[in-house]
Design a protein with these regions (language model features):
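Polytopic alpha-helical membrane proteins, predominantly small-molecule transporters/carriers
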Residues: 1-190
């Protein structure tokens, strides 16, 4: 996962920094590429659920989706923060707000569907992918806000300190989930 995230980020950064392709263009192109991947995946497999990735073909679709997600996330995060001149903190708030809105909507719709005894899986799959797509620009906005110089709208912690903060947070989360098992899904709820 880390390698594919780095590749997706580097693709966007190289297109914008070395080839002069605008953030608007890269955002649009990667949004289209991601949409085509989702459509192609669904047409071939009739599902986009990550719980049904049980074949090599589905795994290939998944990793292609992840690659485009990271490329799109980098482009859109930079577009909002830099090109639209909103700054890293505002971009962070926008992406966090969108994630919260989708999560809240998911749980409201889930409740309505449960009352009406309707199938909930499409709502869950859609919510998952929308939130997943938005986590990349959120993470990039947080990283940029922490690492960039204060004159550029950041906190000026630098790349090394920011990386150590992220690494520490990941380690704490992994240790916590390993010890508490709170991330395990009850097989009767699937």
């Amino acid at each position: 996962m880390v390698l594919i995230s780095v590749v997706g980020t580097l693709i966007t950064d190289n297109l914008t920094d070395n080839f002069g392709i605008s953030l608007t263009t890269t955002t649009i192109v990667f949004a289209i590429a991601l949409s085509i991947t989702f459509i192609w995946w669904y047409m071939q497999e009739k599902t986009l659920s990550i719980t049904s990735i049980t074949t090599t073909k589905r795994e290939a679709f998944y990793w292609l989706t992840i690659l485009f997600t990271f490329a799109l996330g980098t482009a859109s995060g930079d577009l909002v923060a830099e090109k639209f001149n909103l700054g890293y903190l505002t971009a962070l708030i926008i992406f966090a707000g969108l994630i919260a809105l989708i999560a809240i909507t998911h749980y409201v719709v889930k409740g309505i569907l449960a009352v009406e005894h309707k199938h909930q899986s499409r709502n869950a799959v859609l919510a998952f992918w929308l939130i997943y797509i938005l986590t990349r620009p959120l993470g990039a906005s947080i990283g940029d806000y922490l690492s960039q110089a204060q004159t550029d709208g950041g906190l000026g912690l630098g790349t090394t300190t920011t990386s150590l903060i992220f690494l520490g947070a990941i380690l704490v989360l992994v240790i916590y989930l390993t010890l508490t098992k709170k991330d395990e899904i009850d097989s009767t709820t699937i």
